[in-house]
Each structure stands twice: as structure tokens, then as C-alpha cells.
Amino acid sequence: MFEAVEGMLAEHADLEQRLGAPETHADARLAKQLNQRYAALSSIIGAYRELQQLDDDIEAARELAQEDPAFAEEAAALTGRRQEVEERLRRLLVPRDAADDKDAILEVKSGEGGEESALFAGDLLRMYTRYAEARGWKVEVLDAAESDLGGYKSVTVAVKAKGTPEPGEAPYALLKFEGGVHRVQRVPVTESQGRVHTSAAGVLVLPEAEQVDVQIDENDLRIDVFRSSGPGGQSVNTTDSAVRITHLPTGIVVSCQNEKSQLQNREQAMRILRSRLLAAAQEKADAEAGEARRSQVRTVDRSERIRTYNFPENRISDHRTGYKAYNLDQVLDGDLQPVLDSCVEADLAARLEALEQ
């Protein structure tokens, strides 16, 4: 497995040279791609060189231990350290999703449960926003349809990192595990009898595509315009500023009404459309290669849940990993990392197992 690192050394040196050239930075997108690859290789090569150094130190300690038994303890400590570094290197070498270095488009939609579901969708958006802010990410609302009580029938946001994140630390690499149906159990604000109700909201996470990632023929698009609407369906704009784009070959439909101008809404809708097309192309490629991942839920249904948020018990349960904690209030306030870590670990374990078969 570690033989592959030898080939990475030359690539790493070449990238270092290219990144030092002024002409590379004239193309911002190319510079970003090279920086991401360089960061990934730097982590791998750093661990590999540390492993080599530990091998030398262990050998030296064992030789010295033949004359002075005190060095036997040092050799044992170094051996333990070597096992840790070897495991870290194995993890770094596990193939990741091609889109793991990208920013994310995140959609939250209310499902069964009416107004209560819409309010819960708002709670989820707040959770993701707080989590993103804690990581220094930027959250931009692309489209939103509010409910009568201030929740969301649907809301779409872009989550963008600052600079070049470490491998596995980009928005999509972490937030992709949020895709699916989230179930909530609590007493709704509309419930007068104090009974606990169950409702659900659906989350879809896409890697944000850049224009060069997906080529879209304008002839394949049908673009409709209409007036933006607010809670209850009332019109909030006197002009046709909202935009609906249909990609005819795939049937994918995207609409945006959050911005004041038709041009801005069209640009935002195209961002979402590119990301959906990129995700669809990746899923098709995975399926053709026989490596299809569990697809994220696109229809909001209570029965296909990935996580339950139980307010009476202050409990959060992830049904994929078995993670359970009684700090729901903190999680909804953005303390989402332990939940995501359980998903990352489960995903990594599955990839390692597949790699070793």
C-alpha cells in the first residue's frame, strides 16, 4: 500500500515548483486545484517521512539496547508511535470522493408534518449555519421559501470554505453525510394538548460545481419567469423576478426567487443546476464502475430517516452509525462535529475494508 507514496514524491516536487511560478497564479482556478493537491500530498508525504525516520530510530534504539537495557523502553515507545503513524498514513491513502475538496450546496425541505416540519427545517438550517460559522465558512442563501410561522418550506444555501482546507476538511467532505431524512419528535408550537408529534425534513447535499466542471448547452434549457411569493403564497414582488430553469435532457428543475433581480436569480439557479448535474454525473459513473454509494434521499419521507432528534429526551441518534448523545440542544446550536466524526469514521472503515479485500 505504501509503495504508492514513492510515485507521489516526484509529483509533490513538481507541484511545489509550479506553485512557485508567478504564471500559475494568473489562473486562480488552476492555482486552487494545485494547492488542494499539494496539501493532500504534503500530508501523505509528511506521514511517510515520519514513518521512515521512526524505522531508523527504532533500529538504532534496538542496537543500543544490546549494550544498555534502558534503550529497550525507548525502542518500545518508538514502536508504539510507529503504529500510530502507520495507521494515519493508511487512512490518508484511502481513496476519497473526487468531490471532497469542493464547497457544498445544501438544500433543506420540509416534509410530513406541515408547519411543524417547516419550523424544523429552519432549525436544521440554523444548526448548519452555526456549525459553518464555527469553522470559519461562509453561508450564502441562494433560495428560500418561508412558511407562515417563520420556518422554511425549502431553503438552499451555498457553504464555502476560506482558503485551501486540509484534506477531508472541505465543506462537501463533511456535510455530505447530512444527506437524507431527519426526523424530529417534539411538542409542536401549534399543539394545544401537549402531545409529542413526529415530523420530518429532508436534506440534500451537493458538491458545488464550477462552470468548467459542467458544460451546459443553452439550447437544453427552458427558462420560465414568475413573481416571487412569500409565506402563504402572497406575491412579494411586482415584477417577474423569480426564475425556473428546466434542464430538458435530464428533467432537472431548479427555481430561485431569493434575489431582487431576474438576472441574479438566474445566476443562482444556474449554480444549483450545475451542482445537480455534476452530482448526477458522478452517481452514474459510480454505478457504472460498480461502486455506487448509498444515494441521498431526494423525496422527503419519514420512513427513510438517517437521524432522529428527540426533544423530550434531549437525544440525538444517528441510525447509520449507532451514534447517540443526550446533548441535542448543543447539536442544534452548531456542535455537530462529534456526529459528523462518527460518520467519517464509519465511512473510512468501510473504505479500508474494501481496499483490503
Curated annotation (Swiss-Prot):
NCBIfam families: prfA, PRK00591.1. Transmembrane segments: none annotated. SMART domains: PCRF. Belongs to the prokaryotic/mitochondrial release factor family. PANTHER family: LD18447P. GO terms for molecular function: translation release factor activity, codon specific. This is Peptide chain release factor 1. It comes from the Bacteria. Peptide chain release factor 1 directs the termination of translation in response to the peptide chain termination codons UAG and UAA. The modification N5-methylglutamine is found at residue 234. It is found in: Cytoplasm. Disulfide bonds: none annotated. GO terms for cellular component: cytoplasm. Keywords: Cytoplasm, Methylation, Protein biosynthesis. InterPro entries: PCRF, Pep_chain_release_fac_I, Pep_chain_release_fac_I_sf, Prokaryotic/Mito_RF, RF-1. Methylated by PrmC. Methylation increases the termination efficiency of RF1.
